[in-house]
Amino acid sequence: MLLNIIGEPKDTESVFCYIPNFITDKEVEKLKTTLSHIEFIPNYNYTETKIIRYQKWYQQDNKYFCNKWGNKYKRWESNEYFTELENFQKLITARLKQYNFEKLGINIPDFNSCLINKYLENNYIRPHRDTDKAFGKEPFIAGISIGSPAKISFKRVLYKGHNKGLSKQDKKKYFLNFSWNLEPNSVFIMAGSSQKYWTHEVEKKNNKDTRISLTFRKQI
């Protein structure tokens, strides 16, 4: 397990954790057949001219990804949980609770959403912070990796009370930037003030094997 805890202003902390072999091949197999039948929707770059990955948004209360956004896109419309996903979410929640994150002052939420991303060759996710308008200022985020490995990078940015947009990189603390390799069946976790002071990105895939990620959060 990798754990990176970074002290932040106002006595807060950004918490990052990586746990390899968090789920088993057998547990993944229960999902794979269903995942293979999902009709994923393309996600594009900022100019909506190039596909950068494919996705499907699931929310147990049928909520749009972020109702406070000005523009609406089909890819962020809610889909109903299927049985295998609901069972998998329960499994993930129970297993996370075994790691005693409460000792770090972090509680495991009752997840109510899952964003499933599919990455093909040359796909990626650009640097971003998960919007506080949908998930609050200090969300607990758990990302499961299935299939091809990937590299995730975290970069320090300035925070001015909200995390709209990318903001400017914190050049005085760039030395804190770091990256992790995400192996199949692993989970990476972001919590505390991580979505205030850090962007994260999944770098461009350079192989032809498909990668699937499932990101669990509690939408407010």
Give the location of each predicted region:
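Non-heme Fe(II) oxygenase metal-center motifs and adjacent flexible, charged/small-residue loops
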Residues: 1-220
